[in-house]
Structures are given as C-alpha cells and as structure tokens.
C-alpha cells in the first residue's frame, strides 16, 4: 500500500511539474503565411517609414512600401484579429514574394525564436492597427522591440497603420488607462492618470522628439497630446 501511495504521489508531482512547464511552450503567437518565404527578394531593399492614419488602406502608399521592401518578404505584427491583413497585402496590393502575420496575445511570445527569425529575414515589417496598449505591454523592452530597431538600422522599411503608426514616435499615446481618453477629459486633467504618454519603445532617428497618435478629429483626441 505504501509503495502504491508513493507512486501515486510521485505521479501527481510529475503532472504538476509538467503543468508548470507548459506555459513556456504555449507562448507562441498565431502565425499565418502566404507565398514562398524562401524565394529570392526581387528588388533592392531601401529604408523608409510608412505612417498611415488608419481606416481605408491607401494602396498607392502600400505599393510604395512594398517597393521599398524590394517587393520581397513582409512580416506583419498585430495583437488582435487574425491573418486578414496579410491576405489583403498579398492578394490585393500584390507584388510581394511572401507575407507572414503574427498575432500576439501575451508578452512571452515576443521572445519566440520563430518570430525573431522571421523579423531578422524580413525585407519590410508592418505594424497593424488595434490596441496600442497591447503593443506597449507585449513588445516594449523585449526581443521584438529590439528586432524592430535593428530592422530600421539595417536600412529596411517599417510601416504601420492606426495603432501601428502610434507606436513609431519617440513619444506616443499608450492608451494604458484601459480606454481611449478624449479631448475634454484630457484637458480637464492634463497630468492625470488617464493621459498615458509613453516612451522607450522604438528608437527611430527620423522620429526622435516626435509624438505620434491617430484619429484626431474623428475620435476627438487632439487634446490628449
């Protein structure tokens, strides 16, 4: 009986240890791929920053971005929805060898080796729209944040729309209050806890000293800057 109980206890302990280890393997973002990621980049890769306000996509601007990326391999980062934006880039904008989309749901995924390999080989990186507070929480001070800076330093283009634009300035509205403060509330208490201006995210020389945000008139946001 004693030996049986001991075996049961050891088995239970082993299951607990396994359960404790599982999150380390589960921290992987959703991944969507279109095209051939091993194909040769057709054109010359050049530096460039694309800042899109959001809403309807400007295809002329997107084609400029794809050309800056040598019409090669694009990696899209986001923290909501799925791979639709990659389908749009590949099937509607067109003219690229491949597009990979990673959808993050936690900070741990920003250390995933597969993500970092994709970012290192990317000809262009695009930050999708969404909730910029997730981007701050998931990417600031992580290997993904460092990879974005390294990408730009290497002379490759970086783009973003809406929240993905907001993340590019040296200073940005982070929406860390759990909402999206509007002008009357921000101006009533400009130094209050709802006015979350963040920094120490990306270190882009062209946007040094610049604060970025979007949807000013449509969503009554100008006062929060």
Residue spans of the language-model regions?
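Hydrophobic, well-ordered secondary-structure scaffolds
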Residues: 17-19, 168
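Class I SAM-dependent methyltransferase SAM-binding "motif I" and its flanking Rossmann-like core
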Residues: 27, 136-222
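Bacterial N-terminal signal peptides that target proteins for export
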Residues: 1-15
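Extended, subdomain-level signal for the structured scaffold at the beginning of enzyme domains
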Residues: 27-135
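N-terminal signal peptide c-region/cleavage motif recognized by signal peptidases
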Residues: 21-24
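Short, contiguous, well-ordered secondary-structure segments
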Residues: 3, 123-129, 146-149
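Active-site-adjacent alpha/beta core region of enzyme catalytic domains
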Residues: 225
């Amino acid at each position: 009986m004693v030996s049986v109980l001991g075996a049961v206890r050891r088995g239970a302990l082993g299951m607990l240890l396994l359960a404790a280890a599982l999150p380390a393997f589960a921290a992987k973002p959703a991944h969507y791929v279109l095209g051939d990621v091993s194909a040769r980049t057709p054109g010359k890769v050049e530096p460039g920053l694309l800042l899109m306000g959001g809403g309807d996509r400007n295809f002329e601007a997107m084609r400029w971005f794809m050309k800056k990326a040598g019409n090669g391999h694009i990696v899209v980062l986001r923290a909501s929805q799925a791979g639709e934006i990659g389908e749009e880039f590949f099937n509607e904008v067109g003219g690229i060898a491949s597009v990979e989309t990673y959808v993050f749901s936690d900070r741990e995924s920003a250390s995933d080796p597969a993500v970092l390999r994709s970012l290192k080989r990317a000809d262009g990186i695009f930050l999708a729209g969404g909730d910029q507070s997730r981007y701050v929480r998931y990417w600031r001070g992580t290997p993904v944040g460092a990879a974005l800076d390294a990408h730009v330093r290497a002379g490759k283009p970086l783009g973003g729309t809406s929240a993905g634009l907001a993340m590019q300035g040296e200073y940005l509205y982070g929406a860390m209050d759990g909402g999206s403060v509007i002008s009357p509330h921000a101006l009533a208490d400009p130094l209050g806890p709802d006015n979350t201006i963040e920094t120490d995210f990306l270190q882009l020389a062209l946007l040094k000293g610049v604060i970025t945000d979007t949807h000013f008139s449509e969503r009554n946001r100008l006062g929060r800057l």
